[in-house]
Amino acid sequence: MNILKSLISVGIMTLISRIFGFFRDVLIAHIFGASMFTDAFFIAFKIPNLLRRIFAEGAFYQSFIPILIDYKSRKDKEYIQEFIRSTCGFTILVLTTFVILGIIFSDYIIFISAPGFSESSKKLQLASNLLKIMFPYILFISLSSLCSSILNSYNYFFIPSLSSSLLNISIIVFSFFFSDYFEPSIISLAWSVMIGGFFQLFYQFPHLYKIKMLVFPKINFKNIGLIKVLKKMGPSTLGSCANQISLIFNTIFSSLLHSGSISWIYYADRLIEFPIGIIGVSLSTILFTSFSCSYSNNTQSEYKILLNWGIRFGLILSLPISVILFMFSKPLVIILFQYGKFTDFDVLMTQKALELYSFGLVSFILVKILVSAFYSCQEVNIPMRISILTLFLTQLMNPFLIFYFQHSGLALSCSIASWINFFLLYWKLYQKGIINFKLNDFIFIFRLLIAVLVMTFFLIFMLYFIPSWKIGSFFDKIIRLFTILSISGIVYLIALHFLGIRLLNYSDKLFQKK
């Protein structure tokens, strides 16, 4: 498998999905602004999203793929199909029960997730109604993730990465054409989420059929593969839950702050998730499969090479982007969100949160790579323990940081906790002898920092000649921003070249060793 080719393919599709996602958020900001209605929607939407990250993209994904890849190399097709049938049947049974309970107890879930909503019965009831509509999304997206995991295991990365765009397209279509048919109109977004999840699932069926892995679900708790997945899912779920519980606590804190805080954090989070999705998710998705193959084939040298390549490539891409996000936080918020009911005050509040999120971007991305390295060799306890520790530290920091920074203190605590998470994971890999920090690694980081510094000085110089970002049409601003960032990217690449970091040669070395 050509890792760089797969990475580019997934990265491009993720970029397209994120562009749709930004267009979606621009529409929401334009139509609804930062109001009681958006706060209610974002809280309700966050709950199935948190569950998606735990069940679909977290514990299940990390436990299922290594076992499936191991079976691919040792078992016949019928054995693998039986494993998939049993896994699918178990997933449907558990999550259908979960969805029914979630709909029944939606009022209590909202009250626990956002206690600040209790001051407004209308806000609480609206969020509860939205949650009832969206709860089935967790079933659709979890089954979609199962399909994606199977396709990824067979080195089909393009199709699963495209499916994420379908949710954004659904929300865009409903915002444009159906919002006037609902009262209040924010309910249209809830229906768009559920329908988008439906299409994300069924879109992948023809591609599963092509590889003869489209099978009918079956309830079989005795399947050996399923039992292995469930055993691994215990610690994996705790690790995933720790991260998501931290987000729930952040939501609770933000619900107690100034009205609009939830929306400001959401919009800043959307901006920081853009590079995390394109770089972090793409890298970890591709590398996770490669790590699992290396572990299954017992080729530790290849495993170490892949991990070193992933960390270095992640640093090369994430460091300059973190600087750009910090320096261009205000222009990005203005260009993408300041329309309709989104005010100057909303821009300022979102900007503050984004600036503090940007400090953690590098660690957000590197943590995904390191966690993939652990899970691929079926080591789930270490990431779980570190996740629980960082959850505890984050919630210790939150009250103090909120006192000084209000809602943006939540962004800062996430960034600090992510760096702690990264260093602890790195240290554990170092103790295991998987990572060895050598002199050439120090030289690499030093050269990389110089290249980023050169780009930063160039950006500072360019900012002196840039007119106010409030001047010009949307497309004028986009062209202006794209031009500046493109030139800055070229400056960065030239600096890397002169400092001896040549991306093409660097990638070629990886494939030669593979």
UniProtKB/Swiss-Prot annotation:
UniProt-recorded Gene Ontology molecular function terms: lipid-linked peptidoglycan transporter activity
Pathway where it operates: Cell wall biogenesis; peptidoglycan biosynthesis
Principal subcellular localization: membrane
Single biological process term from Gene Ontology: regulation of cell shape
Transmembrane domains' residue ranges: 3-23, 25-45, 92-112, 130-150, 157-177, 186-206, 245-265, 271-291, 315-335, 354-374, 386-406, 409-429, 448-468, 481-501
DNA damage in keyword set: no
Cellular component, GO, one term: plasma membrane
Subcellular location: Cell inner membrane
InterPro entries: Lipid_II_flippase_MurJ/MviN, MurJ
Topology of this chain in the membrane: Multi-pass membrane protein
Superkingdom as given in the UniProt entry: Bacteria
Record's keyword terms, sorted: Cell inner membrane, Cell membrane, Cell shape, Cell wall biogenesis/degradation, Membrane, Peptidoglycan synthesis, Transmembrane, Transmembrane helix, Transport
HAMAP family according to UniProt: MurJ_MviN (MF_02078)
Family named by the database record: Belongs to the MurJ/MviN family.
NCBIfam families named in the record: murJ_mviN
Its biological purpose: Involved in peptidoglycan biosynthesis. Transports lipid-linked peptidoglycan precursors from the inner to the outer leaflet of the cytoplasmic membrane.
Protein's UniProt name: Probable lipid II flippase MurJ
Organism: Buchnera aphidicola subsp. Schizaphis graminum (strain Sg)
This protein's encoding gene: murJ
